[in-house]
Amino acid sequence: MAAKLLKGAEVAKEIRAELKTEVEQLQSKHGVVPGLVTILVGENPASQSYVRAKQNTAHELGFHSVQDNQPADLEENRLLDLIDKYNKDPSIHGILVQLPLPKHINENRILLSIDPSKDVDAFHPVNVGKLMIGEPDYLPCTPAGIQELLVRSGTQVSGAEVTIVGRSNIVGKPIAMMLVQKANGANATITVCHTRTKDVASHTRRADILIVAAGVAEYVKGNMIKPGAVVIDVGVNEVGKTADGKRILKGDVAFDEAVEVASAITPVPGGVGPMTITMLMKNTVRACKVHNKIA
């Protein structure tokens, strides 16, 4: 029996509708709108595409949205000055620096310079620490999207065996921290696999919920999945192009095999990806309320 598709695009649309109502209420009752600035250094085509998608969503929701494009040779100190300006701007509640940055700029130094209360990506060590102790102001966007997708699909997370393949600071580590907390949509037992894990399949076959963020196309095969498991495929890998030049994308899970074993699975594209930008918008609305002391 083919698995149910967990279509993040549809869930993200529902959440955006909720956020739009919230933004309208912020404006009508309190006279404020969420403000988001996206800083793009250079002309990386993929980064330009991501920034465009974020800006389009922000406009759709009625945000005060600023796109600050800077040349690839921008000096690091100039970028720090820009961030300082937005840190002090009361109309801006969220600051997003699009990564990767040019090699001459120290990414860690840049991310550390963002006011943690405006760090809507939740990358700042202050926000990572708050997540660790279970008191986050903002949740990292892709893990938050995964958790929201699990909750809204009715997946039983509490008490579940969850295996995460990948230990990145953006997905693997934070989703492990989130799902182990004493909280709704959490209370799971977590295993994290990585490049030094021996016999990854022995861990993935135990998982009631399998989250794969390995960065390798079709790394997890159907025979590595527990029958009836819920599979969250975070990977987006370009494996070629069609005759008319369109990208061919594959996830980190061999979809055609997995769909015959799992009870539910996210497609690629259209699964986790759309949730990430939507959760960024949710964090920005939250930041607006925090800065304006709105409960």
Swiss-Prot record:
The molecular function terms in GO held by this entry are: methenyltetrahydrofolate cyclohydrolase activity; methylenetetrahydrofolate dehydrogenase (NADP+) activity
Tell me which species this is from: Syntrophobacter fumaroxidans (strain DSM 10017 / MPOB)
User: Which domain of life, per UniProt?
Assistant: Bacteria
**Lineage of the organism:** Bacteria, Pseudomonadati, Thermodesulfobacteriota, Syntrophobacteria, Syntrophobacterales
Gene Ontology annotations for the cellular component aspect, listed alphabetically: cytosol
Reactions catalysed, as given in the entry: (6R)-5,10-methylene-5,6,7,8-tetrahydrofolate + NADP(+) = (6R)-5,10-methenyltetrahydrofolate + NADPH; (6R)-5,10-methenyltetrahydrofolate + H2O = (6R)-10-formyltetrahydrofolate + H(+)
CDD domains per the UniProt record, alphabetical: NAD_bind_m-THF_DH_Cyclohyd
Which pathway does it take part in?
Answer: One-carbon metabolism; tetrahydrofolate interconversion
Q: What is this protein called?
A: Bifunctional protein FolD
Q: Which family does it belong to?
A: Belongs to the tetrahydrofolate dehydrogenase/cyclohydrolase family.
